[in-house]
Every structure is written in structure tokens, then in C-alpha cells.
Amino acid sequence: MSKLEKLVEELSALSVLEAADLSKLLEEKWGVSAAAPVAAAGPAAAAAPAEAAEEQTEFTVVLTAGGDKKINVIKEVRGVRPDLGLKEAKDLVEGAPQNVVENVSKQVAEEIAKKLTEAGATVQVK
């Protein structure tokens, strides 16, 4: 085993606290800082929100208009939101735009949007 391989093995055996202490000791010994330059972190930080937007996992179904068949839409709203009574479902449909469901998977959001659209509502998945 070479000298470098032995060193790698020994460093791999360090605990996190020991590795942090080693880092501090080396910074003092060599007169350097382990912190990344601020300018280098800027572009990476700007790219992160774009990636997060592409990886959206939670969606909201928004009822934008109740349509002409409000009774059917109210029935479907009560079907997807059993916690709502008749009055609350009616108020939600008549008060459009309103969020019907929030923080659901894409598949569930699309299923709910399809049901409401078939009932005569105009919906949007965000």
C-alpha cells in the first residue's frame, strides 16, 4: 500500500468532528481558508431555483370558473373534498377563482382537474 493510500485510509476513518478539527488545524498551519469564494457561489445559487421549479412535486388545483353546470361542479367538489359541506362547496364554486386542493401529486391533481372539467368547470393546475 502506497503512502497516499495509507493516508486516505486514515482520513476515511476520522469522525466528522475529527475531520472538522483537522480542517481548522490545516487552515491555521497553511494560512488559508476552506470557505468557498462568494463569487463562485453566486451562479450556483442562481441555478438552484430554476432546478427546483423543474422538479415541482406538489400541485394545486384552482377552480377558475364554475361554468354553466354549477350543480354538477358542486357535486364533484364535494367528491374530491369530502370535508366540505354543501354550503361550503357551493361557496367555493361561486367564489371562483378558488383553490380546490393544495399540495397534491401531479397525478392526483390531473385526475381532479379532469373530473371538474368534465363536470363543466374551468380549472387550472399550478
UniProtKB/Swiss-Prot annotation:
Biological role stated in the UniProt entry: Forms part of the ribosomal stalk which helps the ribosome interact with GTP-bound translation factors. Is thus essential for accurate translation.
Family affiliation: Belongs to the bacterial ribosomal protein bL12 family.
Name of the protein described by the UniProt record: Large ribosomal subunit protein bL12
Coiled coil: none
A Gene Ontology biological process term: translation
Keyword set includes Ribosomal protein: yes
InterPro entries attached to this UniProt entry: Ribosomal_bL12 (IPR000206), Ribosomal_bL12_C (IPR013823), Ribosomal_bL12_C/ClpS-like (IPR014719), Ribosomal_bL12_oligo (IPR008932), Ribosomal_bL12_oligo_N_sf (IPR036235)
Species annotation: Caulobacter sp. (strain K31)
Cross-referenced PANTHER family: 39S RIBOSOMAL PROTEIN L12, LARGE RIBOSOMAL SUBUNIT PROTEIN BL12M
Sample GO molecular function, one term: structural constituent of ribosome
GO cellular component: cytosolic large ribosomal subunit
Alphabetical keyword list: Ribonucleoprotein, Ribosomal protein
Subunit structure: Homodimer. Part of the ribosomal stalk of the 50S ribosomal subunit. Forms a multimeric L10(L12)X complex, where L10 forms an elongated spine to which 2 to 4 L12 dimers bind in a sequential fashion. Binds GTP-bound translation factors.
Gene3D superfamilies: 3.30.1390.10, Single helix bin
